[in-house]
Amino acid sequence: MSYSLEFSEAVFDTLEDLGHTDAKRLRQVFLKILSLRRSPRPPDSEQLSHFTYRGFTGFRVTQGEYRIVYAIDEKTKVVKLARILHRDRDFRELDHI
């Protein structure tokens, strides 16, 4: 069964910024996001023990230099995308979501 995707404003902003600076990376990140519809817990995903998003356990996957942070609502089959962070940025930024 396919999951729906729900994008936070921060994710939209990051995708827009990537579109202005690096179309190739934008495409790679967006394809990784789309793949979460079929498999929200791919083998390269990692559960984030210190982070919840809208009451759900957080996960992350990596695409190139970017970390895609999200949560999964199994009841409604929705992948809730919280942030896209460059690998150089600290996960402490997630405390401000």
Task: Give the residues covered by each predicted segment.
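Arg/Lys-rich, positively charged N-terminal/basic patches that mediate binding to nucleic acids
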Residues: 1-32
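Short acidic/His/Gly/Ser-rich catalytic and metal-binding motifs that mark active-site loops
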Residues: 4, 42, 91
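Active-site micro-motifs of SAM-dependent methyltransferase domains
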Residues: 13, 35, 86-89
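A short, surface-exposed loop/turn module that caps and links secondary-structure elements
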Residues: 34-62
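Preference for short coil/turn "hinge" residues that link or interrupt alpha-helices
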Residues: 11, 41-44, 72, 84
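Enriched for short, Lys/Arg-rich terminal
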Residues: 18, 24, 58-67, 71-97
